[in-house]
């Protein structure tokens, strides 16, 4: 599974990129607005920090303007994935931009039917929102299973399942078990994947025993 971080915080992105485990970044206008900086400047800076896909979202709602915005975003860097909403205009935009060689992330997916349409439109990524479905008492993870099964039925479909709206480490684990190709995760949740109380307890014990020996490696 690939790990993307869902943030526009440059410091957080640099810290996670330094681990060598970060495969990409997803952003949206809300995340970038929190930085108080120019949208295009932030996106360009992120593209310079990570080599993998950086999702940057259009803000228009009609296909002609989405396409124009998408082309402008794609010029920022080769690793831009233009993010478009799962609407008919978004699907039209996806078809055009992917035809021009631009990566496209189709976002706000809440059904398997939507995911099938996105794949037909040539989407590089489809972003089903797990947490938001859970919020309305639907099974967000079941959607990942459904999309995986449909895509596997048609090997010609190359769209990657990008699990989004992830709230917890269990969401990440369950998405991996369901066959998601990518999980985009908030920084705190991503860092928390390495945490376990027994790991901490074991490390404390090892260090206490080592200290008693009076030895050093360096």
Curated annotation (Swiss-Prot):
GO BP: carbohydrate metabolic process; pentose-phosphate shunt
Coiled coil: none
One Gene Ontology cellular component: cytoplasm
Source taxon at top rank: Bacteria
GO molecular function: aldehyde-lyase activity; transaldolase activity
Function field: Transaldolase is important for the balance of metabolites in the pentose-phosphate pathway.
Protein name: Probable transaldolase
């Amino acid at each position: 599974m690939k790990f993307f971080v869902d943030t526009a915080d440059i410091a957080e992105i640099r810290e996670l990129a330094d681990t060598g485990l970060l495969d990409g970044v997803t952003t949206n206008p809300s995340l970038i607005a929190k930085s108080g900086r120019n949208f295009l400047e932030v996106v360009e800076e992120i593209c310079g920090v990570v080599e993998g896909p950086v999702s940057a979202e259009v803000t228009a709602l009609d296909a002609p303007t989405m396409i124009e915005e998408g082309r402008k975003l794609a010029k920022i860097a080769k690793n831009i994935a233009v993010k478009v909403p799962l609407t008919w205009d978004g699907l039209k935009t996806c078809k055009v931009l992917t035809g021009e060689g631009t990566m496209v992330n189709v976002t706000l997916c809440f059904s398997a039917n939507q995911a099938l349409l996105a794949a037909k439109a040539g989407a590089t990524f489809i972003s089903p929102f797990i947490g938001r479905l859970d919020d309305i008492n639907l099974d967000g993870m079941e959607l990942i299973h459904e999309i995986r099964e449909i895509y596997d039925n048609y090997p010609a479909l190359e769209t990657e399942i990008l699990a989004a709206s992830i709230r917890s480490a269990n969401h990440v684990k369950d998405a991996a078990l369901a066959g998601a190709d990518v999980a985009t995760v908030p920084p705190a949740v991503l860092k928390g994947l390495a945490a376990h109380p027994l790991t901490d307890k074991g490390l404390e014990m090892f260090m206490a025993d080592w200290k008693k020996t009076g030895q050093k490696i360096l």
